[in-house]
Regions:
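Extracellular/lumenal glycan-associated context and N-glycosylation machinery
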Residues: 1-87
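An amphipathic, basic-hydrophobic helix/alpha-beta surface used to engage anionic
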Residues: 3-7, 70-219
Length: 219
């Protein structure tokens, strides 16, 4: 088994995404992952230093400030998780394109809860630079987000694995989920640039195709 195959199997086991999934895709508790962001890690190191200093110098106010900030950070984990849980995803519209033009896939996100979902970002897992602008979902609403995938070959293009993430509310925690809607787009061959003109009619042929340049179609 090659390293790439092992990595693909490990990711399928870890993220529970083995290929295109039937709609609707529901983001349950087991599909959401939570880790601190770089800012969250920096804050954690700072809080650890504050705690050690408070212990060393017996600072009551230092303890209070450390645990107060730590409690706020802990609560942000809960809010980041709730921002994604129970969302439903279904594939939207994807029109055919010519090779070389980006294929645009519509993704429908359904929020059945009575609370808003804030600061969401959607992007292809293997291409984070193609991320959407941060967007919100109103309570009991459906929103459409568009993912543009570059095309290099003609034929059917399958929508790759996507990542939906949030860093709401404080940017300390990154919560995300991976999924792959069963959606594809037809990519036509690109038209030839500066193509030669079509050949003129041949007078030696009979029938309707025998008309050459300058012949009238009507008597």
């Amino acid at each position: 088994m090659s390293l790439a195959q092992f990595r693909a199997r490990f990711q399928r086991w870890l993220f529970r995404v083995g290929g295109p999934e039937p709609a609707p895709i529901r983001l349950g508790q087991r599909r959401i992952f939570v880790l601190p962001s770089r800012f969250g890690l920096a804050l954690g190191i700072t809080l650890l230093a504050m705690l050690l200093a408070s212990i060393n110098y017996t600072l009551s106010l230092g303890f209070a400030l450390t645990f107060l900030i730590g409690g706020v950070a802990w609560i942000s984990i809960h809010h980041a998780f709730r921002n994604l849980v129970d969302l439903a995803i279904t594939p939207g519209r994807s029109d055919a394109v010519f090779c070389g033009s980006p294929a645009r896939f519509g993704i429908l996100l359904h929020n059945a809860a009575h609370r808003s979902r804030l600061g969401l970002v959607l992007f292809p897992t293997q291409a984070p630079t193609l991320r959407t602008h941060p967007f919100d979902l109103s309570p009991e609403s459906t929103a459409t987000q568009e993912i543009a995938i570059p095309t290099a070959t003609r034929g059917w293009l399958t929508l790759p694995r996507l990542t939906l993430e949030t860093r709401h509310p404080l940017g300390l925690i990154r919560a995300w989920s991976l999924f792959q809607p069963d959606q594809r787009c037809l990519v036509y061959p690109a038209p030839e640039a500066d193509a030669p003109p079509l050949p003129l009619g041949d007078d030696s042929r009979s029938g309707a195709g025998a008309q050459g340049r300058g012949r009238d179609d009507f008597a």
